[in-house]
Regions:
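Thiamine diphosphate
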Residues: 2-114
């Protein structure tokens, strides 16, 4: 470059940094869902198998969505696909999720509110 020129005056050709990949739409694309139902669906899609949580007013719609999901998807033995384990307090839920993740190698999910 010459003195007084900048890169915008003479841009270099850009090389592609990533390839675009066509992905099929999600099986539930277009279905009307609440925010709480979306949270549960994302957890399911990510392979979450257990949730640890302590209920409070702000998180109740999400808990209701977990219960609805479990009712709709129980296995033949009647087991819930994503059990919700409720400890004595919020701190316990966090410790349980962390311990579960370390012991199992799976994602530990803690859902609490203040």
């Amino acid at each position: 470059m010459k003195l007084g020129e900048n890169r915008l005056d003479n841009p270099e050709p850009m090389t592609p940094r990533a390839q675009t990949v066509e992905t099929p739409p999600h099986p539930l694309a277009g279905k009307r869902m609440t925010g709480a139902e979306m949270i549960v669906q994302v957890l399911v899609d990510e392979g979450v198998q257990t949730i640890f949580g302590y209920s409070g007013g702000a998180i109740l719609p999400t808990y209701d969505a977990v219960f609805r999901y479990n009712d709709e998807h129980r296995d033949e033995a009647g087991n819930a696909p994503i059990p919700l384990i409720v400890p004595a307090n919020e701190q316990g839920a966090g410790f349980m999720a962390a311990g579960y993740a370390r012991a199992s190698g799976r994602v530990g999910v803690c859902m609490v509110t203040s």
